[in-house]
């Protein structure tokens, strides 16, 4: 068992080690994330997790969430990867803008994540309900040993909430939780069954508590002794903010790509 799971909790209580059972066959690990310009972190993720992850679903859009043009550049980078990594990648190119437009940045962001989840699942074949769906942003990398344990064992809840080690500008510069808003957990890992039943494969809902509103579905899970309360796992990976080459063009791209409606930025002022 990975050491990080020894202190994992559900509703504040640790799970007994006897809860976990070795599977007769491994389940598939599906890792999905949107991509913008973080080529270095993408390479780190792929090389670190390729031996555990069965499918990487990567979404690239030809427009930003602020509505500006965003040239598709990922395909030409992926061909340089070794085949044992490249063969595990499902690239989704998003070319249809959100129907609501870009005036509401949060809605535009939700449209991006919804497309990632639903279109990615639509293109997969032979999905099993106990497969594991891992949803992160492109600057977040879960620990390989955690995913390997989930791949090989049963006994954990239908979803996991991860606390990631946060750093800025590079993995070497970690943020002290005391000054970084405290220890934060985000829902990020779930069974395909949970993803289907509670979110209809809409990844924009993964980091919310919207599942708690579906009382009828929760009762169905309880009736068969299945837990939907997320298991919290501390220090379950890395979140490296602003970790890319310090070029002005990349900085401008980052700022203008993700600014929501309440935070409009003009490149003329940068």
Regions found by a protein language model. Give the residues of each.
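Juxtamembrane luminal stem/stalk of type II transmembrane Golgi/ER carbohydrate-processing enzymes
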Residues: 1-32, 270
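Active-site-proximal specificity loops/subdomain of glycosyltransferases
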Residues: 15, 20-26, 63-136, 143-148
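Short His-Asn-centered micro-motif
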Residues: 31-36, 59-60, 135-138, 162-165
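Active-site beta-to-alpha loop of glycosyltransferases that engages the nucleotide-sugar donor
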Residues: 33-47, 51, 61-63
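Conserved catalytic core of nucleotide-sugar-dependent glycosyltransferases
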Residues: 140-269
């Amino acid at each position: 068992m990975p050491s990080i799971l020894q202190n994992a909790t559900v509703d504040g209580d640790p799970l007994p080690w006897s809860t976990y059972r070795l599977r007769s066959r491994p389940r598939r690990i599906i890792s999905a994330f949107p991509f913008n310009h973080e080529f270095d972190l993408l390479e780190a993720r792929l090389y670190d997790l390729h031996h555990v992850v069965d499918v990487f679903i990567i979404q690239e859009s030809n427009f930003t969430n602020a509505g500006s043009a965003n040239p598709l550049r990922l395909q030409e980078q992926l061909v340089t990867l070794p085949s044992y990594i490249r063969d595990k990648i499902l690239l989704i190119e998003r070319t249809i803008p959100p129907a609501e437009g870009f005036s509401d940045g949060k809605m535009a962001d939700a449209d991006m994540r919804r497309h990632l989840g639903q279109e990615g699942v639509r293109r997969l074949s032979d999905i099993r309900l106990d497969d594991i769906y891992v949803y992160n942003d492109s600057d977040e990398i879960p620990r390989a040993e955690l995913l390997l344990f989930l791949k090989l064992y049963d006994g954990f809840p239908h979803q996991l909430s991860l606390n990631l080690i946060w750093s800025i500008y590079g993995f070497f510069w970690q943020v002290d939780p005391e000054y970084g808003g405290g220890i934060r957990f985000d829902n990020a890992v779930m069974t395909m069954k949970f993803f289907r039943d509670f979110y209809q494969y809409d990844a924009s809902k993964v980091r919310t508590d919207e599942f708690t509103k579906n009382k009828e579905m929760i009762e169905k899970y309880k009736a068969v002794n299945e837990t939907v309360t997320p298991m919290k796992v501390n220090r379950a990976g890395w979140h490296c903010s602003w970790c890319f080459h310090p070029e002005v063009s990349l900085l401008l791209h980052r700022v203008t790509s993700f600014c929501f409606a309440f935070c409009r930025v003009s490149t003329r002022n940068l």
